Amino acid sequence: MTLKIAIAGAGGRMGRQLIQAVHSAEGVELGAAFERKGSSLVGTDAGELAGIGHLGVAVSDDLESQKDKFDLLIDFTRPEGTLEHIAFCVANNKKMVIGTTGFDENGKTAIKAASDKIAIVFASNFSVGVNLVFKLLEKAAKVMGDYCDIEVIEAHHRHKVDAPSGTALSMGEHIAKTLGRDLKTHGVFCREGITGERKRDEIGFSTIRASDVVGEHTVWFADIGERVEISHKASSRMTFANGAVRAGKWLENKANGLFDMTDVLDLNNL
């Protein structure tokens, strides 16, 4: 049976890429596309919006009216909107792939609670390469982490509204967990003025926002006399869109539970 997918935030940069990814993938079809209430894009054909021609799926601002047209919702929007969509999906037994970043602890708790009822893949980054980098960071941290300074440097386009990026935070969390540290107490997100000498157990973060950078992340493991850098650079949002569709297909036979791309890609068995 073909998996029917809906896209939230269909008119955004990521939403349009997701429409393209669904259209080009095997075993899935676009069932619905959504925009915020009152958007000028409501009624527009989703395929024409994404530049791939007429698909016969009109953008809607009402999930309830479209609920019989999709099995799974892919959501890369804003935390407040995603939380509303989660409530709808729980009430209507719809699976979710969530790529929204910037959730506070209450938001993360809501996602975990929802996963008791429905199947969710929630990840800060859906790139296969980035998720492989997570595993490489764990290995590097295990070998070098207690003997070097660790810094996470990330760059994104000028329109990104949260900092550091969800991916950068995930990188820090993978490193911290490997080293038995708590990122909340060991993460350093701002340095200015007289900061004093750097502590060995800090995990530092630096953020760049400029132009149209899709996404770049580099982690330094810096020791005296040498430095190891692990980097990932994305040149197109399609890498994230294709990963999200892959995650959706992986969820097809899952009834409930909270998963991430480590599960989708089976990286724990590397």
Curated annotation (Swiss-Prot):
Belongs to the DapB family. The gene is dapB. It is found in: Cytoplasm. NAD(+) binds at residues 9-14, 35, 99-101, 123-126. Catalyzes the conversion of 4-hydroxy-tetrahydrodipicolinate (HTPA) to tetrahydrodipicolinate. The active site is at residues 156, 160. Its EC number is 1.17.1.8. It catalyses: (S)-2,3,4,5-tetrahydrodipicolinate + NAD(+) + H2O = (2S,4S)-4-hydroxy-2,3,4,5-tetrahydrodipicolinate + NADH + H(+); (S)-2,3,4,5-tetrahydrodipicolinate + NADP(+) + H2O = (2S,4S)-4-hydroxy-2,3,4,5-tetrahydrodipicolinate + NADPH + H(+). This is 4-hydroxy-tetrahydrodipicolinate reductase. Keywords: Amino-acid biosynthesis, Cytoplasm, Diaminopimelate biosynthesis, Lysine biosynthesis, NAD, NADP, Oxidoreductase. One of its GO terms (molecular function) is oxidoreductase activity, acting on CH or CH2 groups, NAD or NADP as acceptor.
